[in-house]
Amino acid sequence: MTGYKRVLLKLSGEMFGGGKVGVDPDVVQTVAREIAAVVNAGVQIAIVTGGGNFFRGAELQQRGMDRVRADYMGMLGIVMNCLALQDFLEKLGVETRVQTAITMGQVAEPYIPRRAIRHMEKGRVVIFGAGMGMPFFSTDTVAVQRALESRCDVVLVAKNGVDGVYTADPHKDPTATKFDDLTYDEAIARGLRIMDQTAFALCGENKLPMVVFGMEPEGNILRVVQGERIGTLVTAG
């Protein structure tokens, strides 16, 4: 069983809200505990969060809002999640830095990859906020881009309500089966929607592995980081 030295953890915005609009403190506290366990195990970790518990640009666009403006609103929602997670991590004694793609000098550092790497080398958690800082990019793609630029060994995609990648939506199709292993080419060819296809393609081109797993039970993040085989491992093949 082999572990990782530096990981990028992708968390959905819906997870922060516990299925509702806003931030659920109990959920964020649980996630912070899990991340603290990873840090205490000596693993370097960076995090990208979504903002779907506040805004989704594509959905607001369908209701008539300008997509660019809606996406920027989503980026601000992501920063709120970052600050909430930072607060709970620091209450646990974990040094944390938030870096944002849009300058917000009073609450976060600007996104500087070399500084992010240095923070992780010092044992700090780095939380990347405000997406890519540009509209039309999903946080899935941002997670992969940040992982590549900060030289992470793997992208860990933590999911709520599903424990890996399936042939179809297991909540809708009782015949759906879970993949233990998968290649990016297969994921793209099958049209699997666990992450967007741009993220899959970017990982595949750069041979960056991804593990898709469920957040439950508590402790799964540490298990994955330490090399335990849970969820689905996606590789370039």
Curated annotation (Swiss-Prot):
GO terms for biological process: 'de novo' CTP biosynthetic process; UDP biosynthetic process. Homohexamer. It catalyses: UMP + ATP = UDP + ADP. GO terms for cellular component: cytoplasm. Belongs to the UMP kinase family. InterPro entries: AceGlu_kinase-like_sf, Asp/Glu/Uridylate_kinase, Uridylate_kinase, Uridylate_kinase_bac. Keywords: ATP-binding, Cytoplasm, Kinase, Nucleotide-binding, Pyrimidine biosynthesis, Transferase. Inhibited by UTP. UMP binds at G51, D71, M132, G133, M134, P135, F136, F137, S138, T139. Its EC number is 2.7.4.22. Pathway: Pyrimidine metabolism; CTP biosynthesis via de novo pathway; UDP from UMP (UMPK route): step 1/1. ATP binds at K10, L11, S12, G13, G52, R56, N160, Y166, D169. This is Uridylate kinase. It is an enzyme of class 2 (transferase). Catalyzes the reversible phosphorylation of UMP to UDP. Gene3D superfamilies: Acetylglutamate kinase-like (3.40.1160.10). It comes from the Bacteria. NCBIfam families: pyrH_bact. The keyword Transferase applies. Its main location: cytoplasm. It is found in: Cytoplasm. One of its GO terms (molecular function) is ATP binding.
